[in-house]
Every structure is written in C-alpha cells, then in structure tokens.
C-alpha cells in the first residue's frame, strides 16, 4: 500500500539584486537549540489537533467543489509547505497564512509554530525498518536571485530544505529539473508535478511525502475477486475486491453519525481508519468532520472479531491547484500584488503564482509474511468476541495517521475505486 503526495509553490516577480543579511525578529540560534530538544507530548498533541483542523477544513472545501469525485491529499504536505513560506512572510501576509493553517496567534508564537513543525518533520524522517516514509522540502531558485541568508538557514534547519539553482529563462529545462527531483523522491510515483512554468517564475518550493505501508495482516491475493462497488443507489461498477476472514481488529459503530469506523494497522507506527457512512449519509459525516470527531473515533474503537472484511483494491490519483481553494480558508494575500514576502529576498517584489498539489493512493493486498501470524494477537485470547461482516462496497473515507507523532498524514475519499 503506497500513498504519495507532492506540492509545488511557484513564486513570480521582478528579479531583484539583494545582498544577504540577517533578520533578528526571533533568534535563529535560540530556535535551532530548542528544535534539537525533544518536543513535549502536549506540544505534539496541540500541533496534531491544529493540523487535523486544517485537514478537515481543506477537505470540506475540496468535497464541496467536487462532491462526487475521489479526493486524495496530504494535509501535512500542504501545511508544512505553507508554514515554510510563512518564514519569509511579514505583516498581514504572515497572519493570513498562519491563521489559515488554524493557528491562534494570541496563544501560539510564530517561533513555537516553526519549532513544532521542525520537530514533527524530524521525527518522521527518522529511519525505521518497518515504516517507509520519505518527507522533505526543496527550493529551486532563479540563478540570478539572491535570497536572505536568514531565510535560507531557517528553511534548512527547521524544514530540512534542500536548495538548488535553476534557470527559469529556460522553462523546459527548469521544469524537467524539478519534475525529475520529485519523481526520484517519490519512487517514480509522481512524474510530472509541474506542467508549465510562468515566464516570471523566480522560485519554486516543493514539498513531497512518500509513504509505503505494509499491512500488519496482509490480504491473500488468491482471495481477491471481482465484485460490485455501489457508486450510489442506482449505479455500480465492477472492482477487484480484497477479502479477509477472521480478522481481530478495532471497530466502532457511530450511531450518532450513521457510520462505521474500522482500523487497519501497518507494521511500524502508521495506522489507517476506514470510515464507512451508511447509504446516503456521506454528506452528514463530511459535515461533522472536526478534530473532536476524530478523537472520539480513536477513543471509541473496541477490539472486535471481524468474520469477513471486504475492501476494494484500487489506485487513484488527484491533482489540485490550491490557488482556487486556499483563499476560501483566508489565505489570499500571497497571491496578490499586496503580498509581503520580503523575508525571502528583502523586497516586496515576490508573490505566489501557483500552488500545485498531486497525490497518489495505492491500496493492495501486500503485507509482510510474518504479520498474519502476529497481527491476530491483541491480548484478548481468553474472551469470545461476536463476529461481524464489514463490506466497503460503497463510498468511504480513509485517514492515515502516524501514531508516533499523532498526526494525520493523508486523507482520502473513495467514491469510485475503478
């Protein structure tokens, strides 16, 4: 099972010549020292809750624009990229970005926000044998553009950002340079993040995240069969349906929201929640998506014995120009002539021309060979549990979280898995 996302922020403007100098709005030395220390559980929970709030707000805007379409995106990829841009923003531009990300600036300082993201990215970048997560940022800078040393150092130290020069006067070559980089970082899953560059492009910021998870208990490919997936009450399509018998996992029936919630774990620190609304109740569930809803689901999950589980095998991809969506979350000024990104170059000649996000979700039977033997053991061996059948044969939601840092990595809505 793989989930890959990439985001590109294209900046355009008049190419200034700027000498590199320092900005002392908050001390980089102090911030970097704090970032090297371990974050507290409270810090982690606060950032996780805020990121979830942003994720659901963004999801609702996407769903409103395309109610019957598949949705796949990484809220973490988008929020991390916007937070990175905010390092160079000032005044109202800065406030719009951070408030659009759902931060309360009277309660959380700018320095604490960046420290939180830095710690989160650091934790996710730690090598783990069982998780395959590759997350990072890159800046592609016009060869004649000089950016401030302070901005460059903060992006490197806090957001693990690589910096490259590019000749945007040669747009074909520059586009290939960026797309080849993203393709390499996402194992070839996203080959064309950028389709074309504006002739005034001065900088492209890229965030990518690649996740390949193995089910703790894998589906047997020999059990996969062709079955109906009901798009609505009148239409259906044939899809490959995976099947598993006698699975012990956590489940919750939410009568208030008329949906069922099932957890499937990956090896390592990742876990997926599958949310199956009752027929005709998808919009009700979507409208109720809040951080509190997700917390309720996690706390309410109880171990159950699933007699039969049916889950479609699918691969879906989406791409978005978030310039059409972010203003609805209050992030407007970065796209206008009033944008103040002077913390990047020292002048106000820079604005964002495009925010492109692409994501790919691939769900299949794959799991580790030993997982099927150990995954059934959850400490309930002496208790008899009532079995049930769960069929994901109609539109459903999927939330992938990293339990180690308690944050939402990806969200998806599967309306048509074919």
Curated annotation (Swiss-Prot):
**What processes in GO biological process is this protein linked to?**
response to cytokine; response to peptide hormone
Q: Which Pfam family, an example, fits this chain? A: Serpin
Which range is the signal sequence, renumbered to this chain? 1-20
Name the UniProt key words of this record, in alphabetical order.
Glycoprotein, Protease inhibitor, Secreted, Serine protease inhibitor, Signal
User: What's an example of a GO molecular-function annotation for this chain?
Assistant: serine-type endopeptidase inhibitor activity
**What family is this protein classified in?**
Belongs to the serpin family.
Report the domain remarks: The reactive center loop (RCL) extends out from the body of the protein and directs binding to the target protease. The protease cleaves the serpin at the reactive site within the RCL, establishing a covalent linkage between the serpin reactive site and the protease. The resulting inactive serpin-protease complex is highly stable. Variability within the reactive center loop (RCL) sequences of Serpina3 paralogs may determine target protease specificity.
Per its record, how is this protein called by name? Serine protease inhibitor A3M
């Amino acid at each position: 099972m793989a989930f890959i996302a990439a985001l590109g922020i294209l900046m355009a403007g008049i190419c200034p010549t700027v000498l590199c100098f320092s900005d002392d709005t908050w001390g980089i030395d102090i911030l970097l020292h704090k970032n090297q220390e371990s974050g507290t559980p409270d810090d982690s929970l606060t950032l996780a809750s805020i990121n979830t709030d942003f994720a659901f707000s963004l999801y609702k805007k996407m769903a409103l624009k395309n109610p019957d379409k598949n949705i796949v995106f990484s809220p973490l990829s988008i929020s991390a990229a916007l937070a990175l841009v905010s390092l160079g923003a000032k005044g109202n531009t800065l406030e719009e970005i951070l408030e659009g990300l759902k931060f309360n600036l009277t309660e959380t300082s700018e320095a604490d926000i960046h420290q939180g993201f830095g710690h989160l990215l650091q934790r996710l970048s730690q090598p783990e044998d069982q998780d395959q997560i590759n997350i990072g940022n890159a800046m592609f800078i016009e060869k004649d553009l000089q950016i401030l040393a302070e901005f460059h150092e903060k992006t490197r130290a806090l957001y693990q950002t690589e910096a490259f020069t590019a000749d945007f006067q040669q747009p074909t070559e520059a586009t290939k340079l960026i797309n080849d980089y993203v393709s390499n970082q996402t194992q070839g899953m996203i080959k064309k993040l950028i389709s074309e560059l504006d002739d005034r492009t001065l900088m492209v910021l890229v965030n990518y995240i690649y996740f390949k998870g193995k089910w703790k208990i894998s589906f047997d490919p020999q059990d996969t069969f062709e079955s109906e997936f009901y798009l609505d009450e009148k239409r259906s399509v044939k899809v490959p349906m995976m099947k598993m018998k006698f699975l012990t996992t956590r489940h919750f029936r939410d009568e208030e929201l008329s949906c069922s919630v099932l957890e499937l774990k990956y090896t390592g620190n990742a876990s997926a929640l599958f949310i199956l609304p009752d027929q005709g109740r998808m919009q009700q569930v979507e409208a109720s998506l809040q951080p509190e809803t997700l917390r309720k689901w996690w706390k309410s999950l109880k171990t159950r014995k699933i007699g039969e589980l049916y889950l479609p095998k699918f691969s879906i991809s989406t791409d978005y120009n978030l310039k059409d969506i972010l203003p609805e979350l209050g992030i407007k000024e970065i796209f206008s002539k009033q944008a103040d990104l002077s913390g990047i170059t020292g002048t106000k000649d820079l604005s964002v021309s495009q925010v492109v996000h692409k994501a790919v979700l691939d769900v299949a039977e794959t799991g580790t060979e030993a997982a099927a033997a150990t995954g059934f053991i959850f400490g309930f061996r002496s208790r008899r549990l009532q079995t049930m059948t769960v069929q994901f044969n109609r539109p459903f939601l999927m939330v992938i979280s990293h339990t180690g840092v308690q944050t939402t990595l990806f969200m998806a809505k599967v309306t048509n898995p074919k």
